[in-house]
Regions:
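Short beta-strand scaffold segments in enzyme catalytic cores
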Residues: 16, 39-43, 140-142, 148, ...
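A generic local secondary-structure boundary/capping motif
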Residues: 30-32, 129, 139, 155-160
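Conserved, helical-rich catalytic subdomain that frames metal- and/or nucleotide-binding sites
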Residues: 51-53, 144, 148-239, 252-272, ...
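Contiguous, small/hydrophobic- and glycine-enriched helical/loop subdomains that border
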Residues: 112-152
Length: 281
């Protein structure tokens, strides 16, 4: 049997507020989108006695043997949802790690979706929710890779056919540790996204919002602050925001030409930064 090929799209937080904390995790609300930057996953059943997981590509270095994919498969086996099947999985990594683009979580989400679609597993709604939480807090967002509002009570509302825009995604040579950034959160916001609507995805509305983790990451890493400032100066027709806990900074544009022009200027000034033009999907 040949491999099935899956595109695992990068997640972007168009806006994010930290609204509180329970015993283990911070509570957040977020307006989430996905962009045309993706990892490629090849998956097939194997006669091997163990799952075989491998990573290749530019961002495959330093991925631990215990990763989101191995975690997912272990959870499915512990819950006895997947029995008598082993898989060979190859992931070609195009999404940088420690960037706030959710690469690992989206890999797990897309494999989970594939296993359900191909009827290898048939979890109940409750089981699916539990699996996602056990693998990682972003995993549930990746099950449908569409514009989504995550409410502060962890409920998800998805929206179709929102207006698309262009994103210049920029990442310096360093990453941000999610744990370190969240551990520095001192203030919480009042929930603002508990009545989700499609209007929230309008360019003008998104411009007014922010990512409450950004100030922490920018104060820890002055280079990030400089990058954001440079992108903001480059065009008054965009808005610029960190995604997740960083270190990727995203400039959003309505026009591809403007996005491409800013990329050219940025690449000349910041030669050691990775940057990519993408479109929301």
């Amino acid at each position: 049997m040949g491999y099935s090929r899956i595109k695992s799209f990068a997640k972007i937080n168009l806006a994010l507020n930290v609204t509180g904390k329970n015993s283990r995790l911070h509570k957040i609300e977020s307006i989430v989108g996905f962009v045309s930057l993706y990892d490629v996953i090849l998956i097939k059943e194997t006669q091997s006695k163990k799952h075989i997981i491998s990573f290749n590509g530019k961002y495959s270095k330093n991925i631990h043997k215990k990763n989101t994919i191995s975690k997912l498969l272990n959870i499915l086996e512990k819950k006895k949802l997947i029995t008598g099947h082993k898989f060979e999985i190859k992931v070609n990594k195009h999404i940088p790690s420690k960037s706030g683009l959710g690469g690992g979580s989206m890999n797990a989400a897309n494999i989970l979706k594939y296993l359900i679609k191909k009827k290898f597993i048939n979890p109940s709604k409750g089981q699916l929710s539990s699996i996602c939480k056990l693998v990682g807090s972003d995993v549930a967002l990746g099950l449908n890779s569409t514009f989504t509002i995550l409410k502060s009570n962890n409920q998800i509302k998805e929206f179709k056919n929102c207006k698309k825009f262009y994103a210049l995604i920029v990442k310096p040579s360093f990453g941000c540790s999610t744990k370190d950034i969240y551990s520095s959160v001192k203030k919480f916001s009042k929930p603002r996204f508990n009545k989700p609507s499609k209007k929230m995805f309008s360019f003008d509305n998104l411009k007014k919002l922010n990512n409450s983790l950004e100030a922490i990451s920018l104060s820890k890493f002055p280079k990030l602050k400089n990058i954001k400032h440079y992108l903001e100066k480059s065009s008054n027709k965009s808005f610029v925001r960190m995604t997740g806990s960083g270190s990727a900074i995203v400039a959003y544009f309505k026009s591809k030409k403007l996005c491409d022009d800013v990329k050219k200027k940025f690449s000349r000034k910041y030669k050691n930064c990775w940057c990519k033009v993408a479109k929301t999907i």
